Amino acid sequence: MMKYFISLSLIALIGLNSCSEPTYPSEYSNQVVVQGYLMANQPIDSIIVRRTARLEEYVSEANLAINGAIVIITSNEINGIVDTLKAMPGNPGFYTSTRNPQNIIKPKQTYTLFVRTPDGRTVTATTTVPDTFHIIAKETFPRVIYYRKGPVVDQTKPYIIDWTSSSMHSDYITSVTSLDSLADQIPRDFGNNNEEKPNRTSYGFNYIDKTHTEIPWFTFHYYGKHMLAILAIDNNYYNFIRQANSGGTDIREIKYDVIGGLGVFGSAAMDSLIVTLQPN
């Protein structure tokens, strides 16, 4: 799940200097960009290390990747983990844990990311993982739902998902992942249906500050089987997406919870359920 976790953040970062006010090639600042997320009760996923892009250059994973970096994740507990990540073959700029057995991320634990690039630049960041929670009455939630229709007992009302509270400070977002690669795309209300197909995973950036929400229909792009997830996100990721989504000239005022570079090193706890979406 984490490899899909809101990857648009890196898109915003690598193109940072192309936003807002006019920018000239001479103003380019080569900075290290990191992106990584830890998921409670899951093994360490990949950390991405790249550089910022010049305004005039072709942007790709390969030419922005920083290879040969030292990437380490540590925990602050006594006898905690020290995991040196290794480069992922065929994925420039991606680093992953090769430990066996795997290190499992603990809820309510604090972790630090350390990155040193081949040219000696150092980037660090720290995240405290939200506590776990669970969706209430998951077993009785309908396994088949109809697009933009409510429960059978009253189809004019929305489906509501309730969950227990993450005991630490957390805001929540929703994610919807299509699990059926052959499922039909939901016709768009606006635009051209011949446009590029949407991603299989989409997110509702509604910063839910309570423990219930309506089913977010706008995040469904396909019919068929889906994983509907609730994520409790840490302060780092909340701060980043709250600022990045503001748009306009505010993009230059983003404050990163990263020392020595740009990016986001965040964490989350998640619970999910599986539903099949049928046409209305």
Q: What do these predicted ranges mean?
A:
Residues 1-17:
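Sec-dependent bacterial lipoprotein signal peptides
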